[in-house]
Amino acid sequence: MSLEENVKEAKNAFNILQTLSVEDRDDALDKIVEELRIKKSEVLAANAEDMKAAKLLAESGKLSSSMVKRLDLSSSDKYDSMVQGVLDVKSLPDPLGRVTYARSLDDGLDLYKVSCPVGLLLVIFEARPEVIINITSLAIKSGNAVVLKGGTESAKSFAALSNVVRSALGKSKVPQAAVQLVQSREEVSQLLKLDEYIDLVIPRGSTNLVRHIKDNTKIPVLGHAAGLCSMYVHEDADMELASKLVLDGKTDYPAACNAIETLLINEAVLSSHLPKIAETLTEAKVTLKCDPASLKVLKDMPKVSALVEPSVDQDYNTEFSDLILAIKTVPSLQSAMQHINTHGSKHTDCIITSSEAAANRFMAGIDASGVYWNASTRFADGFRYGYGTEVGISTNKIHARGPMGLDGLTIYKYQLRGNGQVASSYGVGPGKRAFKHTPINIDNISQVSKK
């Protein structure tokens, strides 16, 4: 079967999937959890082979250390978290059939705005084998079919998880064709041309990957090109709080797209706060790329100077995805906001301040999908937002923004329920009817639709 035929098959499977009850969709998720638990050792063994090959590539400079970290399924509780993510998605309310607007246009002529699936998704990702399970669970719950294209570095993990999904769906009412998995690099360019069948592309990977996809398809693309997050320490910030937040934002998981890459610090607290913050960071082996003002404060500190170096302009436009942080001194809140809006990636940015007025100004003025006050940027995550898991993070200014859960994979359709009315009966003049446009109580409809 050709690639186009596979995609067409997935589109046909979507037409079945979108009509299944939430009970049938949830049952498929249960089957995936069962298979993940049964085949855990198989999947981790395959992942270990990918890791072995990836480490060799990293040693030869052909693969970044951050990519290797993203690939590892055995670290910490990553596998169990992946399984729990499926259960969390299952526990969420059905995102389909929700009425968000209702009007009675006339007696017996009622209009409803109802949530529905997007259609056939194409998700292209690098490393991160858990994305297969994350996306599959969200797609099934939201009634979408999906074509998944993984990176070559996760080939064996991809194959093992593909077997899990295929086996699970074979025991459910969700068509196996609703989740298609492809690996050949050559197939990406072909997939990007299939706008007749594919409704939305969601890239998860490097800036270059996202830009390449946006430049080479007519299909709408949802995602973010970079995760260049910043923290700003305001003039009234508590030093201990700032140290704690900056440390977590940079070191909790440096390879994550919600880790901070730039620290902005108000000149009023440069001498009082930066030494403590820098000491905390360098104890965690973070290299600090400093502007002249911050460099002057830190260069003679024995505990930190070995990991301090002058910054260059490009550092403030770089997603390091590593234990590296660019530091810049700013004279005011307005200057901090201007820097972030100029150099940031519209992902997630944070202000550390005791002033609600300053925080509100920052959150209103920063052009990002997430703006935080006294909280780590690492919270920008679908699981932490209560979405179960996420399909990705969008910095687009369209229907979905920020961490995307089920809502990001639904759109809406208008349902008009009548009993034979014709448009020519309405208008101005003799014998014409006027529209009533009477609001219908949405709460009552929502309760009925959930039964």
Curated annotation (Swiss-Prot):
One GO process term, biological-process aspect: L-proline biosynthetic process
Pathway in which this enzyme or protein is active: Amino-acid biosynthesis; L-proline biosynthesis; L-glutamate 5-semialdehyde from L-glutamate: step 2/2
GO CC annotation, single: nucleus
Catalytic activity: L-glutamate 5-semialdehyde + phosphate + NADP(+) = L-glutamyl 5-phosphate + NADPH + H(+)
MF (Gene Ontology): glutamate-5-semialdehyde dehydrogenase activity; NADP binding
Disulfide bond annotation, renumbered to this chain: none
Source domain of life: Eukaryota
The enzyme's E.C. designation: 1.2.1.41
Record keywords, A-Z: Amino-acid biosynthesis, NADP, Oxidoreductase, Proline biosynthesis
InterPro entries according to UniProt: Ald_DH/histidinol_DH, Ald_DH_C, Ald_DH_N, Aldehyde_DH_dom, G-glutamylP_reductase_CS, Glu-5-SA_DH, GPR_dom
One Pfam family from the record: Aldedh
HAMAP family registered for this protein in UniProt: ProA (MF_00412)
Purpose of the protein: Catalyzes the NADPH dependent reduction of L-gamma-glutamyl 5-phosphate into L-glutamate 5-semialdehyde and phosphate. The product spontaneously undergoes cyclization to form 1-pyrroline-5-carboxylate.
Stated family: Belongs to the gamma-glutamyl phosphate reductase family.
This protein's name: Probable gamma-glutamyl phosphate reductase
Organism classification: Eukaryota, Fungi, Dikarya, Ascomycota, Taphrinomycotina
Gene: pro1
